[in-house]
């Protein structure tokens, strides 16, 4: 795989991945301060970090115990680099354990803590500058530090945690037992900002303009005079990739828009009009709907759906590429969240993403993924910076597998049509209500469940459609949107009256976690 990444002269803070469910949020929060940040494996060596030249390092939380035989470790030379290090939860315990302190099961020193707790600051610290002496933080640990290494001192504790914050300012080493990256730590952003700006000396000048200039340079360096194929899905991500690549390599880019029969209502024509017309991208439109739907017939398992679609998507590309000369690269709109949710060596796979785990091993192309260091809100900001109109940039997110993962169970034309029509009504009414910017994502799902109803004087036995609407910043966590009842009522009434084979509407009021945004 060809990795499109950030050039070496950018200030960056590296987050070492120890398997926490929150580790991606650490990088996301740091980026909010205008500082580039990304995750790296905990197996990285001190020499590799020297080559990256970060201004700071964060050791993430994790599910293991630092004293266990299978515990994730750290190259001890990293502590000698002179780079500021912040250990969070497991990261603090790792610093303690490796530098001569003591970590034990929490029952031997206070209690386990899961949830909000009050942090009591006992000394002033640059890390906590501008925050109150007592503050609510999110704890999530089953082990505790009982002895701190030589050169460290106590900064803060809680009722159940004797060492909740420690530091060795001489060596620029800091440890906190709680999670500042989550919103339940009320002053968590201030703490992370203090680390990035005050302790690491970040300038805070990272922006989308930086990203555009450096990614264009990197793309040109990687591609040279060769040709690139881009798959357009109709979503924001691939559209932004198309405009970025066109700026970088011009007519070396050919876009293939594969109509796999799983698109939203009128999506094909809209894609051709927006990107082919307004931006002049060279787009080949391929009607492969029968090819995909035949393969998906009777397939119920969502992971199998994703794999089938991912494989066939690339085989369609192979077929089209064989008609072209000298195509070496396949571009995708893979995001940072896609990579994270598809699993790392320390974290379990949540779901395989079409842009990550669904590609065949015998693929003929090298991959280019210009957005794979960005979160969704950053992609929108990138689109605006590229001069794209808001109707494209704020287009509703749409997964690569399309409506296949918005139809529960086996896919049929009838089920697909219920989702297409109901989704169009939902989007129309959300826009009419002026909520299209407040609600981060919204769509409908054919649940595959039929229920009894009465329409007119007759009995019906038709599908139940679920409405999913969420609010979020980056897609990693989300709350269900509290839509006004009158809006929901109008949407429900219209769907039942206007969409055939539907007689019941339900509203999904589940947050992420525990649920994911998509149902499959």
From Swiss-Prot:
Residue ranges constituting the Glutamine amidotransferase type-1 domain according to the UniProt record: 12-205
Active-site residues per Swiss-Prot or TrEMBL entry: 89, 179, 181
Keywords: ATP-binding, Glutamine amidotransferase, GMP biosynthesis, Ligase, Nucleotide-binding, Purine biosynthesis
Pathway annotation: Purine metabolism; GMP biosynthesis; GMP from XMP (L-Gln route): step 1/1
InterPro entries: Class_I_gatase-like, GATASE, GMP_synth_C, GMP_synth_GATase, GMP_synthase, GMPS_ATP_PPase_dom, NAD/GMP_synthase, Rossmann-like_a/b/a_fold
Top-rank lineage group of the source organism: Bacteria
A Gene Ontology molecular function term of the record: GMP synthase activity
Domain GMPS ATP-PPase residues, every copy: 206-395
Residues holding ATP: 233-239
EC number: 6.3.5.2
Catalyzed reactions: XMP + L-glutamine + ATP + H2O = GMP + L-glutamate + AMP + diphosphate + 2 H(+)
PROSITE patterns: GATASE_TYPE_1 (PS51273), GMPS_ATP_PPASE (PS51553)
Annotated S-S bridges: none
Top EC class, one word: ligase
Pfam families registered for this protein in UniProt: GATase, GMP_synt_C, NAD_synthase
GO CC terms of this entry: cytosol
PANTHER family xrefs: GMP SYNTHASE [GLUTAMINE-HYDROLYZING], GMP SYNTHASE-RELATED
Record function comment: Catalyzes the synthesis of GMP from XMP.
Assembly information from the UniProt record: Homodimer.
NCBIfam families found in the cross-reference section: guaA_Cterm, guaA_Nterm, PRK00074.1
Name of this chain's protein: GMP synthase [glutamine-hydrolyzing]
Native source species: Streptococcus pyogenes serotype M1
Gene name of the encoded protein: guaA
């Amino acid at each position: 795989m060809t990795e499109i990444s950030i050039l070496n002269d950018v200030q960056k803070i590296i987050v070492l991945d120890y398997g926490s469910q929150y580790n991606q949020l650490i990088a996301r929060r740091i980026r909010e301060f205008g500082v580039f940040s990304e995750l790296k494996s905990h197996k990285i060596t001190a020499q590799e970090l020297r080559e990256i030249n970060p201004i700071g390092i964060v050791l993430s939380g994790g599910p293991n115990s630092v004293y266990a035989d299978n515990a994730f470790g750290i190259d001890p030379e990293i502590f000698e680099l002179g780079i500021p290090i912040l250990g969070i939860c497991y990261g603090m315990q790792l610093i303690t354990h490796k530098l001569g302190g003591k970590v034990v099961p929490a029952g031997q020193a206070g209690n386990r803590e899961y949830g909000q707790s009050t942090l009591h600051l006992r000394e002033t610290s640059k890390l906590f500058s501008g925050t109150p002496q007592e503050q609510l933080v999110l704890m999530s640990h089953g082990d505790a530090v009982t002895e701190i290494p030589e050169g460290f001192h106590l900064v803060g504790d809680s009722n159940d945690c004797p060492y909740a914050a420690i530091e060795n300012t001489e060596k620029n080493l800091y440890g906190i037992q709680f999670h500042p990256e989550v919103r339940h730590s009320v002053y968590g952003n201030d703490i992370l900002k203090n680390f990035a700006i005050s302790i690491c000396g970040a300038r805070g000048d990272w922006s989308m303009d930086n990203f555009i200039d450096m990614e264009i340079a990197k793309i040109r360096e990687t591609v040279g005079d060769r040709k690139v194929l881009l798959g357009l899905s109709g979503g924001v991500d691939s559209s932004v990739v198309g405009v970025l690549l066109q700026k970088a390599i011009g007519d070396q880019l050919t876009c293939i828009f594969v109509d796999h029969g799983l698109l939203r209502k009128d999506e094909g024509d809209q894609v051709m009009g927006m990107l082919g017309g307004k931006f002049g991208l060279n787009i080949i439109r391929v009607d492969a709907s029968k090819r995909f739907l035949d393969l998906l017939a009777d397939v119920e398992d969502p992971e199998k759906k994703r794999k089938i679609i991912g494989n066939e998507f690339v085989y369609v590309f192979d077929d089209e590429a064989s008609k072209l000369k000298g195509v070496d690269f396949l571009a995708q709109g893979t995001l940072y969240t896609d990579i994270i949710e598809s699993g790392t060596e320390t974290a379990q796979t949540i779901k395989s993403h079409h842009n990550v785990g669904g590609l065949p091993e015998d693929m003929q192309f090298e991959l280019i993924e210009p957005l794979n260091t960005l979160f969704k809100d950053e992609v929108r900001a990138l689109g605006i910076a590229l001069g794209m109109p808001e109707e494209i940039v704020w287009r509703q997110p749409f997964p690569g597998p399309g409506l296949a993962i918005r139809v529960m169970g086996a896919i049929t034309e009838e089920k697909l049509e219920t989702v297409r029509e109901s989704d169009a009504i939902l989007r129309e009414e959300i826009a009419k209500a002026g909520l299209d910017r407040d609600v981060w994502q919204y769509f409908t799902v054919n649940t595959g469940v039929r229920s009894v109803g009465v329409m007119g004087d007759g009995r019906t036995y038709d599908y139940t459609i679920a409405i999913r609407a969420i609010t979020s910043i980056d897609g990693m966590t989300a709350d269900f949107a509290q839509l006004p009842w009158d809006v929901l009522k109008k949407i429900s009434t219209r769907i039942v009256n206007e969409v055939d084979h539907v007689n019941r509407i339900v509203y999904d009021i589940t947050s992420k976690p525990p649920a994911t945004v998509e149902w499959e």
